[in-house]
C-alpha cells in the first residue's frame, strides 16, 4: 500500500453538538494519534485516549474517526495529529521469506515519520526564504519571551508597558516643576548674552536678562558660581566649623601654607615654626598634613601622635639645616606615616661641624613610604649618635615599615636598632664612586654602609625582613652588621640586589662574642650579590644562620669599577670574628658562586672557610671555577659537613717501633663530606735492627674522629725480607683515627711485627677510603668552677637526666682566675726562681699572689713550653698569698727564662664523675655544653664578669649555663656580703640574659630557696633572712649531698634538676 497523501493532521471547530471528527490519514495503532483542544482563551489541552476520546480505523487503510466522550464546545478547536515513535520494528532474517505487506508497512512508517518531522518544522518560527533577513511569525503571537537585556533583544509587551509608564511618570514630575505661562513666550538669549546675568520680564511680559545689582544676593551667588568662586570663600584652620559645612570638610586636610600657619615657600625663610604648628594642629584634629611645597627648616620636626603626612609630588618636601644631634624629622609616637616627597640635608660630607641625621623612628607601627631621603652626613669615624651620625633613616621602634624610599647621598643609609620591622623595595646608595674620596674604605671615610644592622655602636636589631631592596655603590658595605658590636639576630635578608659596594656586599662580623655582641639565627636567601670590591658575602663569627640559594658572582666589570683598588674576589666566606669568634652551626647550601680567574692582580675564590669553623653545613653549592674554593685544612671536614672535594698533601711518619728511618715518603688526602680518600707511600731509607709494629701517622683531619668504615689496603709492597714472601700485609685503624696499623697475615694469623721485615729499600703503598661519623655538636657537658661543682650527687644526677658524659674541670676553692684558666680562656706570665726551668724536678714561680691560685690548687699545665703539673705553697696565711710550684712531667734539657714565660693550664679533668675519671684529657671541651659556676671565691666580682666574657669568646658554640652565686649563712639581707652578691648576680643576668640559669623569671638560687620546708622553723627563719634554707645545706654554704634532718629534698639534686631543665629548655640535650 502506498502513502498517497501528505496530510498527517486534521483541525476542526466545535459547534457544541458534534462528537465525531474524522482523521484522513493512515495510522498503525490508536496511540499514534495526539488529540488537543484549544479553548476560547487560547489555552491548549491534550486529551487522554480512552478517557476523553476513542479512535476507530486504526491499523487499516481507510482512515477513521476520533470520537469524543462529550461534544466539542461551540468555538473550541480540535487538532488531530499523527505522532509515531521513532523506531524501526521490522526484523528481516537471512534467507527468510519475503512478505510484501511487511515491507510496505516499514516503508510507510518511514514516510510517515518524514511527514511528522515536516509538520513539526512547519510549526517553527522561520525565515520565509534563505535570502530573507527576518523571521515571519505568520500573524501568530510569540509568547513566553524574557524581557530584553541587550540593545537588539526583542521587547515584550510587559517591558514596553512598564517603560512607558515610567517615562510618563518622569515627564509628569518634570512638568510639574516647570515655570509655566498660559500663553506662548519668547526664548531666552544665547549663553554668551545671558552669562553672569539674571532673568527678568519686560513691560510686554517677554523674557529678558539683566545684570544684578552689585553686592546683592544674586551678584554674590553669581560670583560664587564662577570657576574662580571658591577663592572668594574665607577659611582658617583656627576656626571651628559646624558638622556638614564646607569648612568642616576642609579641616580634614591641612596645607602648611594655609591660614593660620602661612609657611613660607621662598626656599630661604625658615618654615620650622609654621610646619611644627601644622603638625601639632593635625595631631589634635586627626587631620592629614599635605606637604604642598618645598620648605626650609632649621630644626627637627617632631611628630608625637598618629598622623599621616603626604607630599603632593616629588618636588614637595623639606630641606633641613637642623643642628648636630637633631634629626630632620622625628617620629616620637606610634602609627605615624610619611608618604612621598623628599627630606633633604645639607649634603656636606667633608664638613667637620655639620653632623646631620634624616628621619628618626622612635615610635612603633610607623610607615615611611616612597620618600627621597638624602644629604645627611657626619664626617669621619663615629661611635655615638648623640651629636648626629649622618644616617638617612634610623629605626629604634617595633613593626616599623621603610618601603620604596630612595636613600641616597648619606653617610649611612639606614640604621636598624629596633625589632620586627620591614625594609622593602628601597634603593640605597651614597654614590661613593662619584665622590672625590673614592678609594678603599677605611674608618676615616665619610661614606659608609647602606644598612647598618644593630646601629653604629652596640645596638640591637631583631626580627626584620629586609626584602627586595637594591644596595649599590656604598662607601663601605651594602648590608653591614655586628662589626660595631651589638646584636643582629633572627632577621631575614631576601631577594635583594647588592652590587658595586666598596667594601663588601653582605658583611656580617662579630667584634667579640659577648652577651651584647653577636650575630646569629639570620636567614640570607635568594639575594643577587655581585662585583663588590672586597667580598660579596662575608660572614665572620656568625652562628646558627641560613645562607641558601644566593647568586654571587664577579665579572670583568669589576676590573674597570675598582681599577687600582683591587681586593680578593671572594664570593662567600665563613671567617673568624673578633677575638677568634668562630662561625658555627650555619647552613650554606645551594648558592651559585662564580669568581674571576686569579691573575697577578686579582685573587679569585668562590668560597672560603676559616679553620675555626665548626658544625656548619656547606652542601650543593655550584662553584665556578670548580677549584677556586679555599678550605685550608682537612680538619674542617671532620668538624663540618662540606661536600667540596679538596686535596691535601702530607708526609707520613712512623709511630712506635724502632730501627727504621723513612726516606722518600709522601701522602695525598682528598676530603669530601665525611669521606677521606687516601693514597700514601713509604720508603725505608735506612734500617738497623728493626722491631715493633708498623704504625703510620698522622693522617690530617682525622684526629679525634670516630671511624665508621674504611677500606684502606696495601696496593703495593716491595723488597721486604724474603721470609715475608708468603705473608700479605693488611691495614687497620690504629690507636687513633689518624693512624694506620699495618699487620702481616701469615698462615691465617694476624702478626703485629711487619716492621721487623723492613730492609733499607723496602717500599709500601696504601690506598682507600676512610669514612668517619658525621660531625654533630657535642652533647657532652664540661663543668668549670668551684666547690659547688665538685659534687658526686650533682654530676651523677646531671648524667642521669641528660644522658651524656660529664667532664669536670672544677676544683673546690678555685678562684675566678683559676676557673677561667681551666677552660683555657686565659694564660698568665711567671718567672722561675733562679732564671731557668731545671732539667728535671720542680721550681717555684714568681710573683707570689693573692686571689689568683688559692692554697691547695693543683693541676696539669704547660710552662715555658714544658709539660708538667703545678701546686701551691702558702706564703701568708693571713692574706692567703700563695706561690706556684711547677714540676716537669719528664726530664729534659734546662730552659733559660730571661724575664717571664707563659703559664697555661691544660684541659684535664680534675674531679671524678660517674662516667669520666679525673686526669682525662679533653681537648674538645670548646664544643661542649658548659656549666660555669666560678665567682664565689673571687676577690673582684667585676674581674669575674670580665673573665666570663673571655671564656664565652673561647667557646666554639654558645651553649653555656651561668649559675648565680649562693650566700653564706652570715650574708643575710642588708649585709655587705648580701648586697655585693646580689649585685654580682644581677650583673650576670644583665650580661648573659640568654644563658643565665633562670626559667620563666625564676633563677637557680630562687628555685633552691623555694624548696624549703615550711614546717621547719629553721628554714622559715633562713628564708626570712634572705639566705638558703638549712635543710638543703650540709654546712654554712654548700648544697647537701644527702637528705638532711627536716629536709624535703637533697640540695645538690635540686640544683642538678634545675640546670638539666634549663639545658633541655634550650634544646641542647636530654
From Swiss-Prot:
It is found in: Virion. It is an enzyme of class 3 (hydrolase). GO terms for cellular component: virus tail, fiber. Its main location: virion. The keyword Plastid does not apply. Gene3D superfamilies: Single-stranded right-handed beta-helix, Pectin lyase-like. Keywords: Degradation of host cell envelope components during virus entry, Degradation of host lipopolysaccharides during virus entry, Glycosidase, Host-virus interaction, Hydrolase, Late protein, Viral attachment to host adhesion receptor, Viral attachment to host cell, Viral tail fiber protein, Viral tail protein, Virion, Virus entry into host cell. Its EC number is 3.2.1.-. One of its GO terms (biological process) is symbiont entry into host cell via disruption of host cell envelope lipopolysaccharide. InterPro entries: PbH1, Pectin_lyas_fold, Pectin_lyase_fold/virulence. Coiled coil: none annotated. GO terms for molecular function: hydrolase activity, hydrolyzing O-glycosyl compounds. The keyword Hydrolase applies. Structural component of the short non-contractile tail. The tail comprises six spikes that mediate primary attachment to the host cell lipopolysaccharides (LPS) and display endorhamnosidase enzymatic activity, hydrolyzing the linkage between rhamnose and galactose of the O-antigen polysaccharide. Digestion of the LPS brings the capsid near the cell outer membrane. This is Tail spike protein.
Amino acid at each position: 500500500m502506498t502513502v498517497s497523501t501528505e496530510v498527517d493532521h486534521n483541525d476542526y471547530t466545535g459547534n457544541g453538538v458534534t462528537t465525531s471528527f474524522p482523521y484522513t490519514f493512515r495510522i498503525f495503532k490508536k496511540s499514534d494519534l495526539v488529540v488537543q483542544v484549544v479553548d476560547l482563551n487560547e489555552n491548549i489541552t491534550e486529551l487522554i485516549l480512552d478517557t476523553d476520546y476513542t479512535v476507530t480505523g486504526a491499523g487499516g487503510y481507510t482512515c477513521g474517526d476520533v470520537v469524543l466522550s462529550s461534544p466539542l464546545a461551540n468555538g473550541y478547536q480540535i487538532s488531530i495529529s499523527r505522532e509515531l515513535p521513532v523506531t524501526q520494528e521490522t526484523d528481516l532474517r537471512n534467507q527468510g521469506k519475503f512478505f510484501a505487506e511487511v515491507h510496505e508497512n516499514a516503508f510507510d512508517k518511514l514516510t510517515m515519520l518524514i511527514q511528522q518531522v515536516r509538520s513539526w518544522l512547519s510549526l517553527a518560527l522561520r525565515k520565509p526564504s534563505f535570502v530573507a533577513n527576518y523571521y515571519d511569525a505568520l500573524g501568530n503571537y510569540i509568547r513566553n519571551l524574557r524581557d530584553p537585556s541587550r540593545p537588539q533583544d526583542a521587547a515584550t509587551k510587559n517591558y514596553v508597558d512598564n517603560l512607558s509608564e515610567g517615562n510618563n511618570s518622569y515627564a509628569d514630575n518634570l512638568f510639574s516643576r516647570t515655570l509655566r505661562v498660559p500663553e506662548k513666550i519668547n526664548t531666552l538669549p544665547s549663553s554668551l548674552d545671558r552669562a553672569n546675568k539674571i532673568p527678568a520680564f519686560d513691560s510686554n511680559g517677554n523674557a529678558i536678562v539683566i545684570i544684578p545689582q552689585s553686592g546683592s544676593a544674586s551678584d554674590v551667588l553669581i560670583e560664587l558660581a564662577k570657576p574662580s568662586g571658591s577663592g572668594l570663600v574665607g577659611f582658617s584652620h583656627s576656626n571651628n566649623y559646624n558638622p556638614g559645612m564646607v569648612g568642616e570638610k576642609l579641616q580634614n586636610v591641612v596645607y602648611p601654607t594655609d591660614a593660620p600657619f602661612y609657611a613660607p615657600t621662598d626656599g630661604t625663610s625658615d618654615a620650622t615654626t609654621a610646619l611644627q604648628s601644622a603638625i601639632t594642629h593635625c595631631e589634635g584634629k586627626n587631620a592629614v598634613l599635605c606637604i604642598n611645597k618645598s620648605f626650609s627648616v632649621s630644626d627637627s620636626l617632631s611628630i608625637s601622635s598618629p598622623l599621616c603626612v603626604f607630599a603632593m609630588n616629588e618636588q614637595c618636601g623639606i630641606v633641613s639645616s637642623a643642628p648636630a644631634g637633631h634629626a630632620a624629622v622625628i617620629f616620637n609616637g606610634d602609627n605615624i606615616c610619611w608618604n612621598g616627597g623628599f627630606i633633604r640635608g645639607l649634603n656636606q660630607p667633608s664638613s667637620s661641624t655639620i653632623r646631620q641625621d634624616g628621619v628618626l623612628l622612635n615610635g612603633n607601627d610607623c610607615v615611611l613610604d616612597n620618600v627621597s631621603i638624602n644629604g645627611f652626613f657626619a664626617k669621619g669615624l663615629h661611635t655615638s649618635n648623640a651629636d648626629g651620625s649622618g644616617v638617612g633613616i634610623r629605626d629604634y621602634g617595633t613593626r616599623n615599615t621603610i618601603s620604596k624610599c630612595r636613600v641616597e647621598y648619606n653617610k649611612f643609609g639606614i640604621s636598624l636598632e629596633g625589632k620586627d620591622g620591614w625594609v622593602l623595595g628601597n634603593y640605597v646608595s651614597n654614590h661613593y664612586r662619584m665622590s672625590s674620596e673614592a678609594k678603599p674604605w677605611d674608618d676615616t671615610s665619610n661614606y659608609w654602609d647602606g644598612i647598618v644592622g644593630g646601629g653604629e655602636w652596640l645596638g640591637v636589631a631583631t626580627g626584620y625582613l629586609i626584602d627586595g631592596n637594591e644596595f649599590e655603590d656604598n662607601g663601605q658595605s651594602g648590608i653591614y652588621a655586628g662589626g660595631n658590636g651589638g646584636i643582629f639576630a633572627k632577621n631575614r635578608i631576601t631577594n635583594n640586589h647588592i652590587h658595586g659596594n666598596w667594601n663588601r656586599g653582605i658583611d656580617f662580623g662579630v667584634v667579640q662574642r659577648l652577651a651584647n655582641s653577636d650575630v646569629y639565627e639570620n636567614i640570607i636567601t635568594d639575594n643577587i650579590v655581585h662585583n663588590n670590591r672586597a667580598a660579596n658575602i662575608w660572614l665572620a663569627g656568625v652562628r646558627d644562620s641560613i645562607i641558601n640559594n644566593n647568586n654571587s658572582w664577579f665579572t670583568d666589570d669589576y676590573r674597570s669599577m675598582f681599577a687600582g683598588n683591587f681586593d680578593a674576589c671572594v664570593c662567600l666566606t665563613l671567617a673568624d670574628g673578633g677575638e677568634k669568634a668562630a662561625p658555627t652551626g650555619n647552613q650554606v647550601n645551594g648558592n651559585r658562586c662564580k669568581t674571576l680567574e686569579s691573575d697577578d692582580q686579582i685573587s679569585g675564590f668562590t668560597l672560603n672557610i676559616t679553620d675555626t669553623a665548626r658544625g656548619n653545613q656547606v652542601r650543593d653549592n655550584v662553584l665556578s671555577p670548580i677549584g677556586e674554593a679555599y678550605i685550608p685544612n682537612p680538619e674542617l671536614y671532620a668538624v663540618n659537613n662540606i661536600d667540596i672535594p679538596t686535596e691535601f698533601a702530607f708526609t707520613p711518619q712512623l709511630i712506635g717501633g724502632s730501627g727504621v728511618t723513612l726516606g722518600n715518603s709522601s701522602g695525598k688526602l682528598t676530603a669530601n663530606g665525611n669521606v677521606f680518600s687516601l693514597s700514601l707511600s713509604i720508603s725505608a731509607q735506612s734500617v738497623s735492627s728493626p722491631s715493633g709494629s708498623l704504625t703510620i701517622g698522622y693522617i690530617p683531619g682525622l684526629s679525634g674522629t670516630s671511624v665508621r668504615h674504611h677500606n684502606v689496603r696495601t696496593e703495593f709492597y716491595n723488597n721486604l725480607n724474603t721470609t715475608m714472601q708468603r705473608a700479605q700485609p693488611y691495614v687497620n685503624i690504629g690507636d687513633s683515627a689518624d693512624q694506620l696499623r699495618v699487620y702481616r697475615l701469615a698462615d691465617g694469623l694476624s702478626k703485629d711485627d711487619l716492621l721487623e721485615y723492613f730492609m733499607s729499600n723496602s717500599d709500601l703503598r696504601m690506598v682507600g677510603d676512610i669514612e668517619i661519623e658525621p660531625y654533630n655538636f657535642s652533647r657532652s657537658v664540661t663543668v668549670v668552677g668551684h666547690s659547688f661543682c665538685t659534687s658526686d650527687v650533682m654530676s651523677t644526677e646531671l648524667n642521669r637526666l641528660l644522658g651524656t658524659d660529664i667532664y669536670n674541670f672544677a676544683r673546690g676553692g678555685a678562684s675566678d682566675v683559676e676557673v677561667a684558666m681551666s677552660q683555657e680562656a686565659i694564660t698568665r706570665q711567671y718567672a722561675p726562681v733562679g732564671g731557668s726551668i731545671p732539667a728535671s724536678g720542680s721550681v717555684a714561680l714568681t710573683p707570689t699572689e693573692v686571689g689568683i691560685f688559692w692554697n691547695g690548687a693543683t693541676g696539669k699545665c704547660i710552662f715555658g713550653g714544658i709539660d708538667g703539673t703545678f701546686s701551691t705553697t702558702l706564703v701568708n696565711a693571713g692574706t692567703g698569698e700563695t706561690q706556684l710550684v711547677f714540676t716537669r712531667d719528664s726530664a729534659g734539657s734546662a730552659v733559660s727564662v730571661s724575664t717571664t714565660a707563659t703559664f697555661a693550664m691544660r684541659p684535664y679533668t680534675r674531679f671524678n664523675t660517674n662516667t669520666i675519671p679525673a686526669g682525662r684529657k679533653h681537648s674538645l671541651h670548646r664544643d661542649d655544653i658548659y656549666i660555669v659556676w666560678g665567682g664565689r671565691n673571687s676577690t673582684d666580682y667585676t674581674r669575674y664578669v670580665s673573665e666570663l666574657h673571655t671564656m664565652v669568646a673561647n667557646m666554639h658554640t654558645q651553649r653555656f649555663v651561668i649559675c648565680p652565686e649562693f650566700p653564706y649563712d652570715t650574708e643575710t639581707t642588708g649585709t655587705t656580703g648580701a648586697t655585693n652578691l646580689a649585685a654580682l648576680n644581677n650583673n650576670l643576668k644583665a650580661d648573659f640574659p640568654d644563658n643565665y640559669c633562670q626559667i620563666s623569671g625564676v633563677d637557680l638560687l630562687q628555685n633552691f630557696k623555694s624548696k624549703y620546708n615550711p614546717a621547719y622553723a629553721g628554714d622559715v627563719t633562713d628564708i626570712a633572712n634572705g639566705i638558703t634554707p638549712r635543710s638543703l645545706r650540709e654546712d654554712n654554704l654548700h648544697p647537701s649531698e644527702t637528705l638532711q634532718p627536716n629536709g624535703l629534698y637533697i640540695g645538690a639534686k635540686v640544683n642538678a634538676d634545675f640546670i638539666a631543665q634549663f639545658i633541655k629548655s634550650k634544646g641542647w640535650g636530654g
